[in-house]
From Swiss-Prot:
KW Zinc-finger (keyword) present: no
Function: FAD-dependent sulfhydryl oxidase that catalyzes disulfide bond formation.
Lineage: Viruses, Varidnaviria, Bamfordvirae, Nucleocytoviricota, Megaviricetes
Catalytic activity from the UniProt record: 2 R'C(R)SH + O2 = R'C(R)S-S(R)CR' + H2O2
Required cofactor names: FAD
Cystine bridges: C48-C51
Identification of the protein by name: Putative FAD-linked sulfhydryl oxidase 096R
Ranges of residues in domain ERV/ALR sulfhydryl oxidase: 1-103
Record localization: Membrane
Membrane topology: Single-pass membrane protein
GO CC, alphabetical: membrane
Highest taxon above the source species: Viruses
Amino acid sequence: MSIDPKLWGNAFWSTLHHVAAGYNDHPSLGARQVMTNFIQSIPVLLPCAECQDHAFDYIGRADLDRVVSSRRQLFLFFFNFHNHVNARLNKPQLAAKTVFQRYRVPFDGEAAAATTEPPFHWSPWLTTALAVILVVVVAGIGHRSRFK
């Protein structure tokens, strides 16, 4: 069953950007492993088969060890992932400075333009909590759409 991304897409991207903004600048090995698992689970969480395929492809090409090495790297990964999807859908590209400011992540124009890296303290339980919330939201949308 596929659910129209217009119903869940904005909340999904907002969640990913918030997760990255809350990630530690210098994450522990455990936090990096949890985040790697979270990123790899993203395609499975998506309620759209086409979106799942595209996410598997995009994530499969990423150097996840580098992506999870810092807040900046993780934030840039999700920022670039979001813009990659927007380009595929012929939607406007997000401006790096705007997105970084919105999520209160320090902005370095050079590094952001080069593509890849990014304030509250990250803890492993947050990934689990956000993943559960995302699954509940997606399941709720699917449940409601069946009864319309």
